[in-house]
Each structure stands twice: as structure tokens, then as C-alpha cells.
């Protein structure tokens, strides 16, 4: 047994030696191939240089003599060169040879034969290789077909008239095409190409004349900040011939028809219903009277729904009649079935959906959880009817959603942001809205509050105009009313119940506390309530949620976070844990309107249990105090004196006109850049310029067209001297007339302004004083001209770009190469001001200040900075679920992978180009046991890893 074991060991050692030998032989063969290729490249470059010298010599001879037909020689050279081994179309390691090779090819081509060494090497290479070279296989399969296409395009261009073949520099059309392609390739790479080639790419005067570099900052901001909402083209319905469909599917039964007006009014009063509109159908009493199919009625019976709820009793006949409807009802009032049942009946009345068709029914909801809930309710009825329903929402795998849409679905339940993503993907080939004839917007008030107005508007614009539209909302604020007027046609309004009021079983406590005292108070509340049950803390932003979670972890409190950036499975798990036994609600950040406060506080005190809610508010947030005081009064709770004082003080300011009421919320944070905002932006910019002392004249108004570049330094000194001379002339004239007026220099560009005392003793003393003052001004202007030399400066606003774009554009790794290349100084100025926050009197939004010795250097720097910003914005826009709603997109990103071996598990971390680590989902790959860790970024340097 021992001898056999020894033999096995020897065999393993022998196999290891053989393997090492094979590796060495393979390495040697690759080295030889590399050396051969290097020698080929060297010989080819030398031959190119000789050909260039020969071409120049021919040009000189042609210019001196009668002129030899260089074009014919060049054509012969091209045909001969096609038979030689060259590196045309490949990237050379040395950039200096690129431009030389292009000039040589354009002037005369390659006419001389390559050295015999290269030819011998070409012949011997296939004999030495036992198999096809991978590079040659790649070239023959991928590159050469593309080269053939380009040659065909060039040949077609060469067949054009001679006047169109070349430019003023004598370059051929082929040269222009190749230069344009390479130029586009360099720009697409997103890197600064320094050296001669960079100058040719970025300093081309022709490009500066008519290219995109002349666009002003406003146009640049509008183009770069164009969201997926704006990239979704608006459909021209006049050019589409839609198939007709039937809306009215309701037949009123005899029992309902025989009801008198008084009976209907009494019945609606008992149901707490209020309706507004013309020819409103009467409410029903039983399910049989609704006009639904027998299969739907059987499913309703199996689910145990005995009779319609108030909103269902009135909404079903209205929607089944084909009328547009507005339903104002609280959450949990049964409004989901009020639009789901008519939608199912509407879908069954239409031709079946085939692959490639879009949905017939479209339901939009604000949150993922509500989408899942509506989808679950529809599935209960759709199975018996043979109807497919797809839920489209963020935080989950988009691939499965796309595959289900491609197979065909009659009903789609979606969040607006993810639906825009799907419609923009693959140029709209995945799905479309051409067949949507039944549109539902559920909880429209919450969608506006979350900033979905741009997405909703664009989706509605892309559906057919004669659709049936249903809108449900907990309240009916002005923003929702404006949308209803736009998208609904003669709607019927249904209101169920009264105004939302906080449950009287919930004890509400409002404390006036500054920001720096809230965390300690929160710890005190946790110490008191932690053992009694679960606690829910509300904050304004995702970042604050994550930072507060980290702080509570450090204090030893086990807790979970819930926000839009979390994975869907994490959200569902967290919600499942907090569905019951919730005892305390803490509004760490004050709600911004009354309804939001009611929704937050209403999470506790369910099923007749007592609840407790604590809300923090500071003196700076006094605009929200009246809503809190009103909520306490309506729920019959005592209003604290300090809160009442805050509310009274703010309302007094509103009456005086120094403050403006904050409204009812529901403005959202979505990006809505229309013409009115464009004009408001320009007006604010001009007002800010006047505040900082800039004179508003014609040159300032035209600065946008010139890129905003202005002259400074020496030019300012010249203006100061000219203004001083004008002031001297004016002062002398006034002194001569002995006017008792006070003369003051009005030079805005100089450093000193000296008043002259009125009622001077005599004219001579006044004139001498004026002359002395003017001499001082002229001297200061000359000193300024020497200290501050003539230069150019421009500004670039970056405050409104995404966080990753701002970080990238202000980092020294980005600014350093641009400054070295353009010889312009770039500094970051201003402070970051979030969207929605009012800019202070002495504040400016974050911007880059660019100054350089020449106007060209400043323009180059600004153009390159714009390119970097545009790349970052496009990168963020292309991420799944990154429809811009004024918040930084939290989504899965792709970069390069780094494997970290941890025992039998492997951690894969995804790093972006700028070094930021992002969250990725755990998964298993084939036979590998791979566990991906969630990496939460606390700051650029420190991060925590959790499974």
C-alpha cells in the first residue's frame, strides 16, 4: 500500500512538471509572436515615414513644374497598398504616428514595397503557427467587415463632384470622414486626449463656429438634465388610426331605475356619499345590480364580499357607464375593487392582446407596496377570466418584468418611474401605450407629493385621447385638481366620508426642539418605550435615515431602515415586521403638511388600541406649526403653549406679508423644466447679478449667446481711467458754475469712490481737491492693471446636477488634467443648496469659476467640464430605476468586480470608475458558491459590509 501511494505521488509530480513545461513553451511562443509583431510595426512605421517624405517631395515638384497627376499616383498607391501588410484601422501605441499616417495616405498612399524581412516574416508566420492566431480571427470576423463598409462609403463619396470632395486645405472627403470618426471615438471614450491629437480634436475652429460648444448655459442645462420623462417622445395622436371601443357597459336594473330622487338622496346620505356632476348614475345596493359577468360575481362570492362598500356602490355604475370618475376616499375604504372590477369587464369586451401589443388597462400607484397589493387583488379575479396582469415597479429584477410584457399583458400595474424606464428601453420596443383605453391613477395625491407629476403627465400624453380615465385620491388638493382638469373629460366626483382626522385614541405630543437636541430626546424615548413594543421614526431623506440608523446601532439599539433606496425584499421584510404591535411614532422631522401628519401618526392606534405619537419642531420650521395645531384641535387634544406661540407668530407674519403660507404640499420634487421655469431662472440670475454689483446692460444680456465669457483685469483698469476722466470733466463744469451740489464719482469698476464736499470756500480749492482725487483714482487703476493682468473668466453652475456629477466635477483628479491642458484656473465657489430651499441673501449656489489668460482657454475648459457633467448625467440616467425625481438615484450600478475570498464563500464587490462602492444583490453563479455582500457607503473612505 505504501509503494502504491509513492507511485501516485510521483505521477502527480510528473504531471505538474509537464504542466509547467507546457506553460513555459506557450509563454515562449507568445513572446516570439509579440517580437515578430513588434518588428512588423516598426518596419511599417519606418515605411510610412519614407512614404510621407516621398509624397512631400512630389508635391513640391508638382507645385514647381507643370504638375504631375498626383491623384493618379495616389490612386495607384492606394491599390498597391491594399495588397501590403499595414496597420491601417488599428490604434498605434504612439499617438504621434496617427496624424502622419493619415497625411501619407491622403497625399499619395503607399507605393513602395516593404522590406524583404517583413515579407519573409509574413510568409514564415503561418508556417510556424499550428493554429489560427486569435487576433487574426478577430480581425477577419469583426474588423475587416466594418472596414469594407467604410471603404464602400468612401467610394460613394468619391463619386460625388470634385467641388464636394475636398476642403480649402486640400483634404479629401475620405480624410474628413476618417477624422470625423476618430474624433467621435475619442469623445465617446470620455477621456482627455492630451498632445497634438487633442488639439486637433478640441481646438478645431470650424467646430467652434457651428458646433455644440456655442450653446449657452441654459440650453446646456436643459439638454443635460433632460430626464427619461423628456426623452420619451410625445405621440402625435392625429397620425394614428385607433380602433374604436365600447365604453358604456352598464345596464341599469329595474329596481334601481324605479328609485326616486328623494330615495337616492337618502341612500347617499346614509352611505356618507357626496357626488358632483351631470346625469350621475344612481348607486347600487347589491353586486348583481353592477352589470358584472357571472364569473366575476362567483369570485366575489367566494371571497366573501357580501355587499358593495359605499365607494363601490356609487363608483361601479359610474365607471361601468364609461364616465370619467374622481373618487375621494380614505385608504382602506375599498376603492381598489371600485376600479378593478370595471376594468376587468372593460378588458373582456376588447379584442385579445397578442405579443407586441401594449396593455389595455393601466394602473399607476405611488409606491411599490401598493402596486403589489393591487396586483394581488387583480390576480384573484383575472385567473378565472384568462387575463394576464403584470406588476412593474422598481427595486426588483427588471428582466422578468420585461419578459412578461413581451408575452403580452392586458393589465399593467406600475409605479410611474419604472414605467417610464420600460417605455424608454430599446426605443420603446418592449411595450407601448397605444391600446390603453382604461387609465387609473390611484392615490394621486401621494404621487404628486412624491414628485411624480412629470412622469404622470408624460404617460397620460402618450395614451389615446378618447380613453376612460379614473382618478382616486385621499384628498383633492389644487395640484390634483389641475391634473384632473387636463386629463379627465366631464368627470363625476365622488366624495366618501369627511375630512381626515387623527384617531382620538392616539395621544399626540408636539415638542419645540432644535435639531441638535432631538437625538438625545429620541434616545430618552427609546429607553422608555423600547420594551413596550415597536417604534417608528420618520425623517425627511434617505441619507438622514441611514445616518440615524448608524447612530442608533452604535448606541446598541437593533433597528431597520425603510426608504426608496432599499431592495424590495428588504422593504417587504421590514414592513412585515412592523405591521403589528406598533406602539410609538416619532416624527423626527416635522411633516410638511396636515395630511402627511395624519398619515404618519395614524400608523399606530389600530384596532381600538391606544397609541402614542411625538413630533419635533424647531423655531425655523414655524411655517408648519399651524397644521400641527389644527391637527391637535380637530382630534380634541391640548395644544402646547409654545406650539401655539409658533403658529400665531407665523400667521402674523403671513398677514403682514413678510411670510408666505407653505400651501398643502403635493408639489413634489420632480424635475419640471418648462418655459416658465426657464424665464424664472434667467430673472433670478439677473437679480443675483445686480445684487453682487454687476451692471445689467446689453452685453450682459447677450453673454449667454457668447458662452458667458467676460473680460477682466486690464480692461477693468482702462474703464476706470476713462470713467475718471469723464468725472473730472463733469466736476470741472459744475465747479465753474458754482453749483452747491455734492459730486460723487460713479465709477463702479474702480476701487475708490471719493465724495466732494459741497459749498466749498472757492472754486480753486474745489478744483484742486477734485484733481487730487482723480489722480489717486488713476494711480489706483494703473496699479490694478499691473497687479491683476488682463484675463478672461466664466462661471458654470453645477448645483442642480446629481451628487455623483458634483463630486466628479469638483475632484482634483478631474480638474487637474483640464487645468494643465487648457492653462485655465478652475475653483469651486458657492455652497450646495438643495432643491426647494430658498437661497439666502448672501448665498450663491454651487458653481465653478474658470479664469484663463485667453478667451480660447476659458472656452476649452468650460467645454470639457460640460462634457464631464454630461457623461455623469447620462451615466446616472441609464441606470435602471433612475428616473430623476430630484433625488439621487439609488440603484444597482455596474463597474469592475473585485473578488475577496472568505473561507468557502466569495465576496464580490462592485466598484465604480470613481471608486464608489454600490449595493448589489446576492446570487449564486452556476457551480460557484458566491455570496455578494451589501456594502453601504457611509463616506468616501469608510464603509461597512453586512451580509
Curated annotation (Swiss-Prot):
EC number(s) from the headed UniProt entry: 3.6.4.13
One of the record's GO cellular component terms: nucleus
GO molecular function, one term: ATP hydrolysis activity
Residues in Helicase ATP-binding domain copies: 316-494
Motif residue range(s): Q motif: 285-313
Catalytic activity: ATP + H2O = ADP + phosphate + H(+)
Residues bound to ATP: 329-336
DEAD box (motif): residue ranges: 442-445
Keyword set, alphabetical order: ATP-binding, Coiled coil, Helicase, Hydrolase, Nucleotide-binding, RNA-binding
Tagged with keyword Hydrolase: yes
PROSITE patterns, alphabetized: DEAD_ATP_HELICASE (PS00039), HELICASE_ATP_BIND_1 (PS51192), HELICASE_CTER (PS51194), Q_MOTIF (PS51195)
Gene Ontology terms describing biological process: mRNA splicing, via spliceosome
PANTHER family: ATP-DEPENDENT RNA HELICASE DBP3
Similarity comment: Belongs to the DEAD box helicase family. DDX46/PRP5 subfamily.
Domain notes: The Q motif is unique to and characteristic of the DEAD box family of RNA helicases and controls ATP binding and hydrolysis.
Descriptive protein name: DEAD-box ATP-dependent RNA helicase 45
Source species of the chain: Oryza sativa subsp. japonica
